[in-house]
Each structure stands twice: as C-alpha cells, then as structure tokens.
Amino acid sequence: NYAGGNPGLMQSLFSNPGMPGFPIGQLRLSDPTPPLAMFPEKFSPPFRQAEYTFARGFSSMLPQLRTPYIQTWTFGLQREIVRHTVVEVRYVGNKGTHIWHGFNLNEVNVFENGFLAEFLNAQRNLAINQAAGVNSFQYRGLPGQVPLPIFDAAFGARGSQPALPAASGFSNGTFLNYLRQGQVGAFANALAGSSIYLCRMVGNQLPACARLGFDSPGPFPINFFQANPFAAGAAINLMTDYSYSSYHGLQVQVRRTYSQGLSFTANYTFSKSLSDLFADSPTMTRNYTTLRNRRLDKGPSPFDLRHVFQAYWSWELPFGTGRRWATGSSVVDKIIGGWTLSGIVRWQSGRVFRLSSDRFTVNQNDSGVILNGLTTKDLQKMLTVRPGPNATVFFVDPKLIGPDGRANPEILAPPTTPGVFGQFIYLYGPSLFLPDLALSKEIPLTERVKFDLWVTALNAFNHPSFEVGGVAGSVSIMSTTFGQTTATATGPREIQIRLKLSF
C-alpha cells in the first residue's frame, strides 16, 4: 500500500505560463491554445523516473525492512491493607525497536550549494532597493549590493527561452515575502519544484527540461537543490525501520472485592512516553525535521498521557428489607430497596500537541517557533479553558493572543533567521473528565417473573472535554484563530433507560 501511489498507467496533459511556447502575460483569447506537455510521453515498462519529473514523487521501502518489536519489563508490590482491600504499586516500562517510519529523502539543500549565502545577499539587495523606492531584490549596482548569479539563472534567458518578467522573478510578491520573513527553505523549495525556474538553472542537462524545449545547458548541476532531481519538487518517500519509542509508568491500584454490597477498583498512572515519530500510525509519512539531525524529532509520543485516573464500582444501596436502613413497611421497602449504583469515572491529562509557525527557514519542513521571556513550563501553565465567540472556547491565556487573532509576537513569534530552526515546543491540551453512572433495580413480580430496570447516564454531569490538535496534531501560532477550538473529546450527556422482563 505504501508504494501504491507510484507511477503507473496514467498520463497527464498540462501547460503553465513560462513554459516554451507560452510566454507569461502574452496570451489573448484569440490566440491558439499553447502547446501541451505530456507526462509520460509513452508507456514502456519499466517506467523511468525521468519521465515523471515535475509530475509526481515516488515511494519505496527498505528491502531489509524488519518487523517492529517491543520489550517490556515490570515489577510491583501488592499488600492487603484491610480485609477485602488490596493495594498494588507497579512500575511498567517498555522499549519499541525498529518502528516503521516513512519520510521524505528529497530534503531541499540550502547550505553546501551556496543558496543560503545568496539568499542573504538578496535580502540585503532588497533593503537597499526599497530604500531607493524600488520593490525588487535585483542587483542594480547600488552601493552595498552584490550580483545574484543563482537568481539571475533562475529568472533569466536560457537558450531559446526568454527571460521571465519581473513579476515572476525579482519583483514577485511571494518571493519578496520569503526574503522579508527569512524563509530560505520555502524559496529553495519553490525554485526546485518548478520547471519554469529549475530548467533555466540547469538547462537541458535534466531530461525533463530538454523534453520541455530547453535547448542549452545551464550553469548549475541538476541536483543543485535536491539529491534526486528526477523527482524535482516532490517527495521520495522511504519506509524504514529507524524509529523507536520508550515508555515508563508508575501504576497504583486499589481493589476491593465484593463485601457488604460494595466492590470497586481505582487506579492511577503517572507515565512518560517518548518517540522520534510524532504520528498516530507507523505507516503514515512523517518527515524528519531535517535529515542532518534526526535527533531533533525526539519528543513526547502522540500517545503520551502523563496522568490517568480511573475508577469503577458497584454499590448495593443499603435501603430496604435486610439492609442497614429498613422502614419496616414491606411496600416502602420494596420501593426503596434493591437498588444498585455503579459507575465508571475517568480523568486524564490532555493530549500532547506541537506548536508550529508555517515558516520554512531551513528546508521544506516547519521551523518551529521562538518563545520569548518564558520557559515551556511557564507556557504550559498559561493553558486554560474559557468561553470564546461563536461556540468556540479559548484554551490559552488571553495574553498569548495578539490583536489579529494570531499568537502574541512578544511571547510567541515565528523564526526569521535564514538557515536556523526555532524551538520545537510540545504542550498538553485540556484534561478529560468523563463520569458514567448507572442505577439498576431488580423488581420481582412472582417467583418466576421479574423486571430488571437500568437507568444509565453517559457523561452524567454533561461536562464538556475539549480537544486540541487531535492525535499527533499541531497548532499554528500564525493562525488567526490561535488558541481556539470547537473539537470535543466526549459527547454530551446521554441517558438510556432499559427494561427487561424475565420469566
């Protein structure tokens, strides 16, 4: 299934402005349709990767992919503290090895190829040009400016192909924003994935570019941005067994066996679960932040629940004939007697989520956030639930929200330094509280006929428990609804009444 999206018997036709025969901004309704490019041009298995460049990525798996396994160890103490009641304290640990992890091998490179240095020069050129009233990062020979050979190649003429207009190059609004925001990774990814730009840089050295009509070589190698240029701008997903996990938990349980109409079990777990795979499925593709340092991804597992308390019980209420409190009236005792109250209560700390910024200052993966003047522990304390507008709730302190609805940049800001990641911060959302109660009674009619009555209240107190991010979720500080949620982890109160006649 992982490789099921690989190229097969499918062709696509397309035409983009800037491709050969389709000059940008020069097409009129009366003009003939620009020439269409076809990918692949023909089917002749085995399919060559080069036939799918600029069209789609590929997926594969390690030929020696191993089966994941978990090692578990535990020890505990158990003691009866009073009659019918036992306390057990236990430590449980486990370690997951060879966990399957699919990720993209085609990470964009901005370091060894000199693109980061050119990006910094482009930022400086832009600042100088804007001071002169020109909204462009092109080299204009002004004091302090330097030539930009990479961008000149990406936007300039190549063989018979003309140069791109300023709006598609040095004055492009998206590119200007990348420079202002320090998003060198986003800029590199935009150039690497576009035949319009990459083919002007590498020319007909890349077969896909030659097929598109580029008829001369370019000054840069075809793998300038990505290790596998035949999947330019796309992913080369590899399923591996590189990931791991660990779990350590302290469990305390109190059990009472049935005695005098009461039995119960209550347990509490304090635990910590870590992994380098922040995903809810091992077959889900989850890119490493950077292949240069896979240790950056070690953090809480998406299933990390630090505190969990559960209790369930059954209590025969002490009313009626033969019970502690009897009235002496057979009619009254039949009404108030024979009732059993039971329930299940669960309380747990919130699910973990990761803060993101939608900024790409290193590669095509999120670069994290910048936390100013606070520690992660301080930030966690500022998570609290309060009513919000339009049936939403806020799960953060109002101080964390700016006037535009995004995170307050004085506390939480996006990274802006090209080539440098921010902080990768994991937080825990609102806690969950779920009480389910039931009241039951056996009503004998004759020696052989009886009624059983059950009244069950799920989420008995109608207490909403809100969810943030979902399993393996992230929350963007750049969202205009930062700190808001409408998702609930539990449903509303539900009352069920059942009757059973036995004879």
Regions found by a protein language model. Give the residues of each.
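ATP-dependent adenylate-handling active sites, centered on carboxylate activation for C-N bond formation
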Residues: 1-4, 89
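Short, solvent-exposed micro-motifs at the edges of structured domains
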Residues: 11, 17-22, 27-73, 78-503
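Active-site region of glycoside hydrolase catalytic domains
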Residues: 7
